[in-house]
Amino acid sequence: RGALILKVNYRGSAGYGAKFRLLNYRNLGVGDAWDVLSGVDHLVKQGWVDPGRVGCMGWSQGGYISAFLTTSSKAFKAISVGAGISNWATYYYNTDITPFTVNYLGDDPADDPAIYAKTSPMTHIKKAATPTLIQHGEFDRRVPIPYAYELRQGLEDRGVPVEMVVYKGFGHGLSKPKAVRGAME
C-alpha cells in the first residue's frame, strides 16, 4: 500500500569530489543506470516494492538517465523523461555547456564517436519497450526541445506507447508551482 520514492544519488553527482565524479567518466548513463537499477533491485529484494509497479522519472540529468533507461531496460512499468538528452553526438554541438559533455565523455564526437554512441539513448532505441512520458520546456536552451521530439519519434517508430507534454513558456526548469505539480502527477 502507498508509494515509496527512491531518490538515487547516482555516480557522478556534483559535490562529492573528483573521484566520485570520475566514476561516470566515459560511462555516463551506463553507470547511472546501474545505480538506479541496483537501488530498485534492493527495494524489490527487501519486499518493499512490487517489481511490476515500479516507475522511473527524472529531470535534466535525471531526465537523461530516464531516457537511457527507457531505451536500455525493461525494469519499469512506465518512465517519465523530463528535459532529457537523447543524443550526445548532436548535443555536443547544440548546447551552451559543451564543456560539461567533454568533462564526462572526454572528447568530441568527431574524434571518438564510439563513446557518444555508447552513452546516447537513441543508440539503444531498438530495445525500447517501456511506456514513456516525455516532458520538456518549450524554450529550453540547455537541452533544446528537438531532443524530446527525437526520442518521441524513435519510440513511436518502434510502437512504444509514448506521450509528450510541452510546457509553454518554460525553459530548462519548471518554476511555477502548477507546472511542477503537473510534471509530478
Q: What feature does the model see in each segment?
A:
Residues 1, 7-185:
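Active-site-proximal cap/loop segments of hydrolase catalytic domains
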